[in-house]
Amino acid sequence: MRTLRRLKFMSSPSLSDLGKREPGAAGADERGTQQRRACANATWNSIHNGVIAVFQRKGLPDQELFILNEGVRQLLKTELGSFFTEYLQNQLLTKGMVILRDKIRFYEGQKLLDSLAETWDFFFSDVLPTLQAIFYPVQGKEPSVRQLALLHFRNTITLSVKLEDALARSHACVPPAIAQMLLVLQGVHESRGVTEDYLRLETLIQKVVSPYLGTYGLYSNEGPCTHSCILEKRFLRRSRSGDILAKNPVVRSKSYNTPLLNPVAEHEAEGTASGGTSIRRHSVSEMTSCPEPQGFVDTPDQGPSGTFRSSPSPHSGPCPSRLYPPAHSPEQGPDHGSPPTSSPETLVDQILESVDSDSEGIFIDFGRGSRSSVSDFEAAGGRPSVV
């Protein structure tokens, strides 16, 4: 029993002992906290000085980028890491942009355009990559360091100088860097969506880029167009041809109930006088075609061999729905006074116009074979099938 009581009193310290130990422990914790804060402040100061030196065109010494990276990593692990974004915006970026703006703040006209273009080149080529390298451990958080830097450049420099007045001058020469700056800045959005500052930026872009598709429609030199994009007239050969192509013509018959070709009827022709051979013929009734212009068309001529002879067909008028020009007829030569060959563009226009003017439909004429080809085929003793 005495042993148990002794162990009990030894294991549980008295209140007086707790009171004696508390001031020493609290003091040690406080000293540790102060040391950590002092170290964090020193790290903040080194990062601040390094970033400001970049904006002042002083650059970073050797191995300084590695030291700043390690400092950012250490800060993110402390309780100050949660305030990193606020500190970056309110302290580092704001001071840096003011340094860049003060050099061009009171410029106007062409001098402002040239100075702003040079400032943008320096910021976009040197400052922005260096900031992304220094704060590389912060990647993955939104908004990113790149977005924050570009937004501060837009609000502190681009929208605060007299850029709109400089662009409105009649003989203003806009450097390419100005157009690049505006287009890069218009690709950065805030979490709140479209803001008043973003709309002000779009008004500047309209003076440099035309046509420009903005938040509220398409803008061009002629004025705003709130509908879809418009193709320039020079890209359309002719409006009439475009309308014809848009109609999408198809091959159709005179009536939707009557097909273009009636069913084919087969019959055996009687044997010829020479060899008694029979030829299978296919007859087509009510096939619509166009008359040949001063040409030759195949017409049936019942002979002893059951073949078709070529005979001239009288000209009964032009056919508007022909799919080939009459000037290229094989029977017409240069002595017949035919017009010269048209250009491909004019030829296509004539075909499209004839297609559009034909209310009955498009009919294809296959009867353009020449007399010599038929005669040679008969002499070869072939077995033609006639349609």
Swiss-Prot record:
Quote the cellular component terms of the Gene Ontology held in the record: TORC2 complex
Question: Where are the Phosphoserine residues found in this chain?
Answer: S253, S373
**Positions of the UniProt region annotated as Interaction with RICTOR:** 10-96, 189-219
Question: How the protein assembles, per its UniProt entry?
Answer: Associated component of the mechanistic target of rapamycin complex 2 (mTORC2). Binds directly to MTOR and RICTOR within the TORC2 complex.
What GO biological process, any one, is recorded here?
Answer: positive regulation of phosphatidylinositol 3-kinase/protein kinase B signal transduction
Q: What is this protein called?
A: Proline-rich protein 5
Instruction: Note whether Phosphoprotein occurs among the keywords.
Output: yes
From what superkingdom does this record's organism come? Eukaryota
Keyword terms = Cell cycle, Phosphoprotein, Tumor suppressor
> What family does this chain come from, according to its entry?
Belongs to the PROTOR family.
Q: Per the record, where are the segments of Basic and acidic residues compositional bias?
A: 18-33
* Keyword Secreted attached: no
Instruction: Cite the record's Low complexity compositional bias ranges.
Output: 310-321
Q: Region annotation Disordered: residue ranges?
A: 11-33, 262-347, 365-387
Which InterPro entries has this protein been placed in?
Bit61/PRR5
Q: Report the source organism.
A: Rattus norvegicus (Rat)
Q: What does this protein do?
A: Associated subunit of mTORC2, which regulates cell growth and survival in response to hormonal signals. mTORC2 is activated by growth factors, but, in contrast to mTORC1, seems to be nutrient-insensitive. mTORC2 seems to function upstream of Rho GTPases to regulate the actin cytoskeleton, probably by activating one or more Rho-type guanine nucleotide exchange factors. PRR5 plays an important role in regulation of PDGFRB expression and in modulation of platelet-derived growth factor signaling. May act as a tumor suppressor in breast cancer.
